[in-house]
Amino acid sequence: MADPVLHTFKRQQLSDQFWCEGASFADFNRDGVNDIVSGPWWYEGPGFTHRHELYAPTATFALPLGPMTTVTVPGFEGALGNKNTYSDNFFAFPRDFNGDGWMDVLIVGFPGKETVWFENPKTPDRHWPRHEVFPQTDNESPTFADLTGDGTPELVCITEGAYGYATPDPSDPAKPWTWHRISPVKGYGNFTHGMGLGDVNGDGRTDLIEKDGWWEQPASLAGDPVWTFHATPFGLGGSQMHAYDVNGDGLNDVITALTAHAFGLAWYEQYRDGGEIKFREHILMNKEPSENRYGVKFSELHAVELVDMDGDGLKDIVTGKRFWSHGRVGDPDRNQAAVNYWFRLVREPDHSVDFIPYRIDDNSGVGTQLVVGDVDRNGLPDLVVGNKKGTFVLFHEAKPVSQAEWQKAQPTPVSK
């Protein structure tokens, strides 16, 4: 029998300056090694100590050092300061948009502002040409993913009060992208919380999930039809939402934070009642430690991802605390440790499940985006974070240990 494997994480902080709420990675200089993009910078891998500008980093703030003295600090005011501010850079999505073989990056700005992509100039000593492609990207969890099933990702978001997606012109992706509305205009706004993609009803087509239900993708998208809405409450408005068969019964369930600025993480079990799709709520974590089987509690889950962290074939929940979402005041437990956790999914034969929480880190947290992927190419998913504490990579390590060592590292249930 093979020795059990212990999963640990090593934090590397690339910067303590606040430039963005979302960072990502790709090989930007084509040297075969992944680099990090965070705000106006990209950091050369594998060391990430040498950085280059995508665009001019002009933001600064004045930090008082006493009654008569201030110092100018680069970046937006975050953990290095005292007041709450916001960056102009919330999500980063690398992709080769113009097909020249060099990775570019799509940047979604502050909610309600424009989305642009920066064209890789193929040399590290130049700013990247900026292409504004969509004028107003609403929702606090927009994404860039293949919603339509055509093999090409779309910008999925809200604009002008409706859900939909924007597509580039393949012959000229620098031109303004085309908007395809999928919902009626219902007053959705730039600060609407909670959105995700997934095949809810198992018809092979990707649906759009939001806090009040899900929009069913029709068989044909010709003519931009309005999608069918199925009302189901999925919390008050979290962050990224996911459709996944949690308990292995063949039906996709929904995983979401209950609210991005307070407490709560849940999965909604899909079941059928006379052929009708219904959901049953299972709270994984909430405002009281007793509401988690292992006594874990933290707030501000403003980014939630679903990734197989331990290679067992089941997707696990990866999330954390968005440090100072609204600054020093406002959100509950706002000054608690900026933790990251992964919740290991364990399926039982009777279709019951457990999500075992493992702390990844206690001094980084998440932004509005959390990117989980194999940065150092060792076969294990790492975490990339940009937020008010700075820019981080949390490197995933795994080593065989004795049964006693493994058992000592396991979380202990405090309730049934």
Task: Label every model-predicted segment.
Residues 1-416:
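Beta-propeller-forming repeat regions
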